[in-house]
A protein has these predicted regions:
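Short N-terminal signal/transit or membrane-insertion segments
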Residues: 1-2, 62
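Short, well-ordered alpha-helical segments
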Residues: 2-37
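N-terminal presequence-like segments and the immediate start of the first folded domain
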Residues: 4-7, 42, 70
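Short connector loops at helix/strand junctions that flank enzyme active sites
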Residues: 5, 36-39, 53-59
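A structural signal for short, well-ordered beta-strand segments
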Residues: 8-10, 44, 58-64
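Generic "edge-of-domain/loop-turn" microfeature
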Residues: 17, 46, 65-69
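Short, conserved loop-to-beta-strand elements that form functional interface hotspots
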Residues: 39-48
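C-terminal structural segments of small proteins and small subunits
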Residues: 51-70
């Protein structure tokens, strides 16, 4: 049986690092999406204040199953 997935782009942030920022993105998206099947970190960035990184950010593509009524 063939299947279809939809992909959305979200941005997660954390003061603790890029991995945590990506996890935040997946965790929060999973609260409102069913069938999350994969994630791909597309880019990473950070906020800097007074020469120090204050927030790590990841732009994440999240794939989830498209449900069929068939």
């Amino acid at each position: 049986m063939a299947s279809i997935a939809k992909v959305i782009t979200v941005i997660g942030s954390s003061p603790d690092g890029f991995a945590e920022a990506a996890q935040v993105a997946v965790t929060e998206a999973s609260k409102t999406l069913r069938g999350v099947s994969g994630a791909q970190v597309m880019s990473m960035s950070c906020d800097v204040n007074d020469g120090k990184i204050t927030t790590f950010k990841t732009t994440v593509n999240i794939a989830f199953a498209v449900e069929s009524d068939r």
